[in-house]
Amino acid sequence: MRKKRLPLQALQKAVRDLLTACQTTPLHEHVGETAKLPLIAFGEIRMSLSGAKDTALYRAEMELEVYSSTNSRSEINGILDDVATVLTAARLDMHTAGFAVCDQEITEVQTNPREVRGYDATLRLEVIIQDMEG
């Protein structure tokens, strides 16, 4: 049996580091009651391991949630465009944790008006990750 490590922490750190360095909307791991909008927050992460016996490959789906208090879609669309540009123009760096990113792409984006004021959105990022130590 092969040792298996989950790249959850490495993935979240790589996304946080890249987005913090390359765009201006604040990124939060947890959104408290006093958080100021607009902001980006980590949402759901799903991960599956490939059935290959000789290579540890993971398929991760990470959701980034975007919140805006502006009553037009222009702010949220601009933030989504910035995030999409960053995540498709630069490769996530997970090498220090012993993982390599084989592929990354945005698979879905959804925007919705909020009940009270503003808009929220979800951007889904799919990442194929190889465990270089496994």
Please tell me what each predicted stretch does.
Residues 1-30, 44-134:
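Charged, amphipathic alpha-helical segments and their flanking helix caps
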Residues 36-37, 51:
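Short acidic/glycine-rich loop or secondary-structure boundary segments that cap or lie
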Residues 32-34:
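Short, glycine-/polar-rich solvent-exposed loops and beta-turns at beta-strand/coil boundaries
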